[in-house]
Design a protein with these regions (language model features):
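Catalytic strand-loop segment that frames the active site of acyl-thioester-processing enzymes
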Residues: 1-38, 42, 139-201
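Sequence-level motif detector for i,i+2 pairs with an aromatic at +2
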Residues: 2-7, 54, 61, 156-160, ...
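HotDog/MaoC-like acyl-thioester-processing domains
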Residues: 3-8, 65-75, 81-150, 219, ...
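Short secondary-structure boundary/capping segments within folded domains
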Residues: 30-31, 49, 67-70
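Catalytic adenosine-cofactor/nucleotide-binding cores of aminoacyl-tRNA synthetases and other
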Residues: 46
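Gly/Ser-enriched beta-turn/beta-hairpin loop segments
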Residues: 50-52, 203-204
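Small beta-barrel nucleic-acid-binding modules, principally OB-folds
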Residues: 54-72, 207-222
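Structured core of small recognition/catalytic domains
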Residues: 164-261
Length: 292
């Protein structure tokens, strides 16, 4: 299997870097959007199919491992391929490379669902579409996914982000782009970690940050311009330097659950660029608000 295809090549711009001094996760998803569209277009499942046949490939699940940082000015490229061909969808895989060093910085497993563009119901891939996709199959050596227990409900979750979907968030498929989901989850993370003491003031004074190393993103609903959105978050695990948070995004008008994000990260020493143990006071505050 040799179906790897370059689907993105670019650079990290200064305005894409967050307060942790590296490429913010939402802009990884902007690149992922480019990569997925490039691969789907090569498979005959891109925007042209949406216009001609009324069919879309919608992302329903992403498993992302952030392995190495990308910082201001770093040059990067993405290679993409097909891991699995399913009756009504595909599992795409992507590797994000630091072009200068050749190192893999991020791995992504992305499940897309083939649906009717208007009614959002499943549509089987045609035999021809399946054959083309099989031709892009690749061997995959990305990190294995771990499924962890999650809270059954939202008791103990805190409001962590709230806004309204804007018209300019819509992508070439007519859907709200994933990067905008992740921008909201990033804002939610700031409020969720501040609840146990990792505040902006603390991070500036102590030269500490929050560095994400894993996402498990699930998208089950649809957002449209004008929809009111709320994210609620909970801390579900705390270690010596690591934390795991669960974020739940809902449409406030309909109460529909739109997406969930399981986010794993570490307390980052901004100068050493290494994980740093949580101070005892912060760890105790974190344990006091754990939701299990």
């Amino acid at each position: 299997m040799s179906g790897w295809r370059e689907t993105y090549r670019g650079i990290v711009y200064r305005w894409e870097v967050d307060h942790n001094d590296h490429l913010t996760v939402a802009f990884y998803f902007a690149r992922l959007g480019d990569a997925a569209r490039g691969l789907l277009d090569a498979l005959g499942l891109g925007p042209d199919q949406a216009r001609r046949r009324g069919r879309l490939c919608l992302t329903t699940d992403c498993y992302v491992r952030y392995l190495r940082e990308l910082r201001v000015g770093d040059i990067m490229h993405i290679a993409s391929g097909v891991l699995a061909v399913e009756p009504d969808g595909l599992v795409l895989v992507h590797k994000v490379f630091n072009t200068e060093t050749g190192e893999v910085c991020t791995t992504v497993e992305q499940r897309v669902h083939h649906v009717d563009a208007r009614r959002r119901v499943s549509r089987a891939l045609t035999p021809a579409q399946r054959r083309v996709a099989e031709g892009q199959r690749v061997d995959w050596d990305g990190p294995a996914r771990e499924r962890r227990p999650r809270p059954a409900g939202l008791e103990g979750f805190r409001d962590s982000a709230r806004d309204t979907v804007k018209p300019d968030e819509v992508d070439v498929f007519g859907q709200v782009a994933l990067t905008h989901y992740v921008h909201r989850f990033s804002a939610a993370n700031g409020h969720a970690t501040a609840a146990f003491g990792i505040t902006p003031g603390y991070m500036r004074t102590e030269r500490r940050g929050f560095s994400t190393f894993e996402f498990q993103l699930e998208v089950g609903g649809v957002l449209r311009p004008g929809d009111p959105v709320c994210v609620r978050s909970a801390l579900v695990h705390v270690g010596s330097s690591s934390m795991r948070l669960l974020h739940v995004m809902t449409n406030e008008r309909t109460a529909e659950r739109i997406a969930t994000l399981e986010q794993l990260g570490v307390h980052l020493d901004m100068d050493a660029r290494r994980p740093s143990p949580l101070p005892d006071a912060i760890r105790e505050r974190a344990k006091a608000i754990l939701v299990v």
